[in-house]
Amino acid sequence: MKKVLLAFDGDSFSEGAFEFACSLNKKDQILLTGVFISRVDAKNLWAYSVGVPPAVVPLLEEDIEAESENIERFEDLCNLNNITCKVHKDYYGFAIPELKRETKFADVLLIGSETFYNNLGLGINDYMMNALHGAECPVLLIPESFIFPQRNILAYDGSDSSIYAIKQFSYLFPELCDNPTVLVYCEEENEEIPENEYVYELASQHFPKLKIMKLGGDPKWSFRSWIGEQQNALLISGAFGRSPLSQLFRKSFVSDIVKEHRLPVFIAHR
C-alpha cells in the first residue's frame, strides 16, 4: 500500500487530483492523506525561504470555514470510493515547513490546484512553488481535466536526474509500467542517445512495451511540438528544481508542458 499525499491550497478543492487518486486506488489500494494548507502572507513565505522565522498569521473565519468544508468533502468522497484516508491540518500561520515534513514520510505528493496551473509562467504562485521545490518525495502534477494515463513518456536527457525519475516511477507505479511507453531524447547535431544501451537495458526491464525515439532540432521546441500531439499520456521527468527558486517556473520546461498541454507530470528530483 502506497502513502499518497493530496495537498489542497487555500479554499480550492482539486477534482482532478482526487480523481487521479481514486484511479490509483482502484489499481492498488492506497492510504490517501489529505493535507489542508491555508493561505499565508507572501512576506512570511520569503522569510522562510531565506531562513528567517516567519510571523504567525491568524486565519480568518472564512478561511477556517472553507477548510472545514473541504475536509468534510474529502472524507465523504473517500468513504464513497472506499479509500483509506487520513486528514492532516492545524497548520496555522505558516504551513510550508509542515508540508515539507509530510513529504518526508510519503511515497508521492499529488498537487492539482487550478490556481496553481493558471499561475505557471504567468505570475509566481509563491506558496505552492516553495512547496514543490522543497518536496522530499516525487510529485505528480495533475490537471483538472484529463483522461487517466494510458501511455508513458520518459523524458531522457542523459542526466542523473532523468534516470532517477524513471527508476522512481517504476518502483512506485509498477501497475502503470505495462502501458505503452516511449523514451524520448531530443538531439542536436545528430548526437547519439547518451549511454543508449544502458538506459534501454534498465528501462526495458520495467516497461515491457518500450520504444525509444530521437527528436531533432532545438530540444525545447521539438519536444514541445511533439508532446502536443500526444494524448492520454503521463510525462515522467527529472528536470525540476534546477533553476533558482525565484525563477523556477519561468525557466522549467516542465511547467510549460503542464500549462500548455495539461498532461499529468511525474517529477522526481534528488
Region spans (language model):
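Hydrophobic alpha-helical segments and helix pairs
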Residues: 85-142
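A short acidic, glycine-rich active-site loop
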Residues: 54-69
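Short secondary-structure boundary segments
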Residues: 36, 113, 238-240, 269-270
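Small/aliphatic-rich secondary-structure junction motif
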Residues: 1-55, 134, 147-215, 229-232
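Structural beta-alpha unit
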Residues: 76-109, 205-235, 239-255, 263
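Short, flexible loop segments at boundaries between secondary-structure elements
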Residues: 262-270
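Short glycine-rich, flexible loops that bind phosphorylated cofactors or substrates
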Residues: 13, 118, 243-245
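Redox-cofactor binding/interface segments in oxidoreductases and associated redox assembly factors
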Residues: 6, 111-112, 154, 237
